[in-house]
Amino acid sequence: MFKRLKELLAAYQQKDPAAHSKLEIFFLYPGVHAIICHRIAHWLYKRHHRFLARWVSECSHRRTGIDIHPGATIGRRLVIDHGTGIVIGETAVLGDDVLLYQGVTLGGSGKDVGKRHPTLGDRVTVGAGAKVLGSFTVGHDARIAANAVVLSAVPEDATAVGVPARIVRVGRKRVDTLDHVHIPDPIMQELCRINRRIDELAQG
């Protein structure tokens, strides 16, 4: 346990340039507190102490602003940077060395039971405000841009941006032009469809 705590603090110190010492990280970083509480809650959850697990989880949520369901499976060295508003669902699975920024949601697909939440591979980065919704895999070393809405699988070492998210880069190879002008806008597409329908009715 102490070994894992030590490597967690080291991961924070490595990834957060504002972190000046492990002592500061341990006492003052809500992301660390949320992860420690989740380890306890998850241990209780796996042993079918569901009420106690949810109680620990909710106490952590109120203190840190980070909502991690006790059923979620989280790997080693998870770094939560500016964690306010993060939500991690019950059947979510996170690999090792994942980095999450504020406002991230790892949400469900709407199924009543079973695997409903995403699986993130090792070394995945999810930008601020991004939503990853559904039961699919985000591959190792993938990057999700800020405010993206990911609704399907992301390959390893790929970058996903936009609403809904699309793959713009795999490794060093650019898949599509990365610009904000041409990111699909479903609301605008629907308005255009309605306008076309109105024109058709007017002409008829």
Q: What are these model-predicted stretches?
A:
Residues H61-V168:
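Structural signal for interior beta-strand "rungs" in well-ordered beta-sheet cores
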Residues V170-K173:
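A structural signal for small-residue-enriched, beta-sheet-centric alpha/beta enzyme cores
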